[in-house]
Amino acid sequence: MGLLTKGSPLTWAETVPHIDYIKKHGIAQFINLYHRLKSRHGDQLKWGDEIEYTIVKFDDANKKVRVSCKAEELLNKLQAEEQVNAMLGTANRFLWRPEFGSYMIEGTPGMPYGGLIACFNIVEANMKLRRQVVKKLLKKDETCLSISFPSLGVPGFTFPEVAADRKNDDAANSVFWPEQAVFLGHPRFKNLTKNIKGRRGSKVAINVPIFKDTNTPSPFVEDLSALGGPDDTRDAKPDHIYMDHMGFGMGCCCLQVTFQAVNVDEARWLYDQLTPITPILLALSAATPIFRGKLSNVDSRWDIISASVDDRTPEERGLEPLKNSKWVIDKSRYDSTDCYIYPCSVGYNDIPLQYDETIYKQLIDGNIDEPLAKHIAHMFIRDPHQVFRERIEQDDEKSSEHFETIQSSNWMNMRFKPPPPDAPEIGWRVEFRPTEVQLTDFENAAYCCFVVLLTRMMISFRLTYLMPISMVTENMKRAQQKDAVLNQKFLFRKGLAECKSAPENLKGSEKCGPPSQDIEEMSIDEIINGKKNGFPGLISLIRQFLDSADVDVDTRCTISQYLNFISKRATGEINTLAHWTRGFVQSHPAYKHDSDVNDNIVYDLLKKMDAISNGEDHCEKLLGCYRSKTDHAISAAVRKAEEHMIVSSQKRAH
């Protein structure tokens, strides 16, 4: 979602004179915040998920489905309960926020989940209730799906139907995407679209490889002449699905998990340890094979979002000699991270890092250590796109808005999140960002709990998963390929090694040994389930952690169901949503094996998806035979026992 500041947003031309000021003061804000809170210690594990939903409307008479652009109307109703609860002092069950599309909403639990193992048993129940609450506000021909809509940009894909206007600068001159498909209830989203185009010097160009079926033309070249002149579609490539608007990426739905660390050192350590895991979860959660009504040759939204917000100038993309720009920048501002940030991980930073020398010096002079200073200075090679006229001058001791406007628009696979200055209850956090959103609440809960259990296992066993950061970049590319779970190999640590420089051991760089070369290519199955006489598998390590914990019967059952499900998906016995979707399309009687996924197919696909997500139709190919024992509440006895255990362990730690 990003930073939702109130005010009057500046255009790109209006922003440019303020860029250096905003960067300088953004860094000052970070330095002040860091030193004020760097000694904060003892925060409990709290965590939460963010799920984005698409609202769709079925036209049964014509067998067509469209996105329903009513997010603002829904949010007004959903957020009214939050306002009432605030007045009454009542806890919220969930929170609702806008997303990029006018057909999208984002839901989170009303309060973070706590450190109790029993909390894993209430996650799915909360997700189910969220979906039910939204559906009660919809009409009979509408539904709420946790998917990326496959026909974005197809003529008439919105309800109400609005045509794209290539002459409309507010819609970034797209030939596919109407302004009304962007959420207009907050200026952030439209302004981001315009300012990315303004900085880049042209509209974004997204080209996704087409899936070559038996009847797909070769080369595949679309006739887009009816949509505009040659200049309007000049960036289209043969054998690719062409798109030209931020909405094709940011209009996809995602699943993210944020968790709080005990202190800043643990947050930085977890950021690094989880980074090599991100491509594995991207492949394991693959869910997005269709773009603009065409079957693509990739299974993930990741590179599509990356291209949709790529604001680099031609010089920064290496297309023209450097003249007005400072650097050639290898990646979009939405991509995988280029550096580890924990002091003893720096030996694995093998990618040349572009960073702002002036910003870096300001950070070093402000007593920020080198690894963190380089990470922040690297983020600050990007310019701010969200500047509000009323918020240019700020108190750098009390605000972090200038820092966050750049930090929150560096969309990487991991995000290191300092505490907000105005929320003393929130500590140092890490956000895990690559996972594709799943069709059902069971799947989404399984992935969220799996990631959080990974963090608990990592902290408990202090094993290291680090590899050269360039290998993570390579793995992210492999993870998006069609059927990556079945066909790709991923670079990964082949043996277990204890991290000698874990936060509680770190006294200085003397603990940091040379980078390990103990890396080999493994399948997703081998990484998740283990390899004979080799890596034991992430699930095996999680089970060992759980064996040392006191877990109630229902929670243990639920966690076991989630882990068994993840295990079977890793083997390929259970399909990824992307694989299942391809199979549905290719076996549909209306499919002509030409890569075109027409209205009739999409209608039947989403009808089937709705039935599965509602529990009306159980699909074993997609879900297996697993059921959790999720509940809305933790029993008082279990809560009391686990809280006593946590207090006892904290006393032993001190």
UniProtKB/Swiss-Prot annotation:
Catalytic activity: L-cysteine + L-glutamate + ATP = gamma-L-glutamyl-L-cysteine + ADP + phosphate + H(+)
Superkingdom field: Eukaryota
Keyword entries, A-Z: ATP-binding, Glutathione biosynthesis, Ligase, Nucleotide-binding, Stress response
Single Gene Ontology MF annotation: ATP binding
Deleted gene: phenotype: RNAi-mediated knockdown of gsr-1 in mutants lacking trxr-1 causes an arrest during larval molting characterized by a partial detachment of the old cuticle and an impaired ability to reduce cuticle components. Also results in growth arrest during the postdauer molt. RNAi-mediated knockdown causes a severe loss of viability upon arsenite treatment.
Name by which UniProt lists this protein: Glutamate--cysteine ligase
SUPFAM superfamilies, per database record: Glutamine synthetase/guanido kinase
Pathway(s) served: Sulfur metabolism; glutathione biosynthesis; glutathione from L-cysteine and L-glutamate: step 1/2
InterPro entries from the UniProt entry: GCS, Gln_synth/guanido_kin_cat_dom
EC number: 6.3.2.2
Biological process terms in GO annotation: glutathione biosynthetic process; response to arsenic-containing substance; response to heat; response to reactive oxygen species; response to superoxide
Family the entry assigns: Belongs to the glutamate--cysteine ligase type 3 family.
Protein's organism: Caenorhabditis elegans
Tissues expressing the protein: Expressed in intestine upon arsenite treatment.
